[in-house]
Amino acid sequence: MSTGTVVQVIGAVVDVEFPQDAVPQVYDALKIVGEGSCNGLVLEVQQQLGGGVVRTIAMGTSDGLRRGLEVVNSGSPISVPVGTATLGRIMNVLGEPIDEAGAIGEEERYVIHRSAPSYEDQSNTTELLETGIKVIDLVCPFAKGGKVGLFGGAGVGKTVNMMELINNIAKAHSGLSVFAGVGERTREGNDFYYEMKDSGVLDKVAMVYGQMNEPPGNRLRVALTGLTMAEKFRDEGRDVLLFVDNIYRYTLAGTEVSALLGRMPSAVGYQPTLAEEMGVLQERITSTKTGSITSVQAVYVPADDLTDPSPATTFAHLDATVVLSRQIASLGIYPAVDPLDSTSRQLDPLVVGQEHYDVANGVQTVLQRYKELKDIIAILGMDELSDDDKMTVSRARKIERFLSQPFHVAEVFTGSPGKYVSLKDTIRGFKGILSGEFDHIPEQAFYMVGSIDEAVEKANKKK
């Protein structure tokens, strides 16, 4: 192991000089040997500047760093603990425990920079993953081993939706999950930990946090740390869920690092390597013939603009997109998923079956027609509509309300118990509304219920 010395410190960027014959490779992990808080600080090599000098990004605060400190080259990239020892634990980007519950006690460590599985190793089966959330199962069904994006602006419910998905899937499918908190609020990370503890599924979740207050290096690499842990479970032949909250902060950390390294920015100030950085992460999230990784990624949409380069680049990698709408949230309909904007490759009669496809299509057609009629209603009122259009509006309003659902993880706020609705019940309910079977039931009865039977029961009670 070669040693070098710190020659320049500019915030999170640290230049280190090594002997000419022992220059570290790009992505090698270096360790500071010093006193106080900076002792043991890990640096990741980003560039070789020539003359034995490498430019690195600090994986922690650079407070207390000074020129002349000794640096040791580990000779390999950052490695993190993997395997069942990580379940129920909270770790940082380096795989160190931050939950004060002792050492991880892992049997194996993987480096976080790995290549994606080859074409012949990848699997191509399409099996649906039931989430128990009506609007998702109906309009944008998830595939086992697929990639899903939860798109939304600030405060429309991305994290709550993600927590409900973890809760439902962990309970219904008893699968293992890895949660990577990338640049999100520490409070949310804390809430998530206790939510999992109270639900009794903590021993099936590994948590890796690199929160908002941490340096850009941590936030850029924490998604890779979580992914590496998920890859180990997949390679053992398990079906694993990878939750990333929030993939936009991963892009943002890349932008900060890119600027710190002096690269010329591209569109809207993003890093010129945006597509490549996103591809490196997303191509590794895939299913092989041994096991599957199903990933759900929250994607913050800056200023609710889906054409922003960051969400636009993410779109290309996803199988299903769940778009959360501020207008739907303002109506008090939660989850605030837009059924007309959300898409899924699985919504195909050959995959989901003809009945499911027809019902989903019918729901979207009715809602689209209602959207077109809203302007006429606003100007002329309901009385000017034809009988057919009046019926369409009535059914569309029932569908809108029936798309809402009480969540298990939101019981604390709403006071109503959460509901898991099977796909069969979801299709039956919407099919009934479309066929006119429930035309006699007032629209209020469809709001915040689980299955259609609950809506009927609610209507009977009101009588």
UniProtKB/Swiss-Prot annotation:
It comes from the Bacteria. Keywords: ATP synthesis, ATP-binding, Cell inner membrane, Cell membrane, CF(1), Hydrogen ion transport, Ion transport, Membrane, Nucleotide-binding, Translocase, Transport. Its EC number is 7.1.2.2. ATP binds at G152, G153, A154, G155, V156, G157, K158, T159. One of its GO terms (cellular component) is proton-transporting ATP synthase complex. Its main location: membrane. It is a peripheral membrane protein. It is found in: Cell inner membrane. It catalyses: ATP + H2O + 4 H(+)(in) = ADP + phosphate + 5 H(+)(out). CDD domains: ATP-synt_F1_beta_C, ATP-synt_F1_beta_N, F1-ATPase_beta_CD. GO terms for molecular function: ATP binding; ATP hydrolysis activity; proton-transporting ATP synthase activity, rotational mechanism. SMART domains: AAA. InterPro entries: AAA+_ATPase, ATP-synt_VA_C, ATP_synth_F1_bsu, ATPase_a/bsu_AS, ATPase_alpha/beta_chains, ATPase_F1/V1/A1_a/bsu_N, ATPase_F1/V1/A1_a/bsu_N_sf, ATPase_F1/V1/A1_a/bsu_nucl-bd. It holds the Pfam family ATP-synt_ab_N. PANTHER family: ATP SYNTHASE, ATP SYNTHASE SUBUNIT BETA, MITOCHONDRIAL. Produces ATP from ADP in the presence of a proton gradient across the membrane. The catalytic sites are hosted primarily by the beta subunits. HAMAP family: ATP_synth_beta_bact. Belongs to the ATPase alpha/beta chains family. F-type ATPases have 2 components, CF(1) - the catalytic core - and CF(0) - the membrane proton channel. CF(1) has five subunits: alpha(3), beta(3), gamma(1), delta(1), epsilon(1). CF(0) has three main subunits: a(1), b(2) and c(9-12). The alpha and beta chains form an alternating ring which encloses part of the gamma chain. CF(1) is attached to CF(0) by a central stalk formed by the gamma and epsilon chains, while a peripheral stalk is formed by the delta and b chains. This is ATP synthase subunit beta. The gene is atpD.
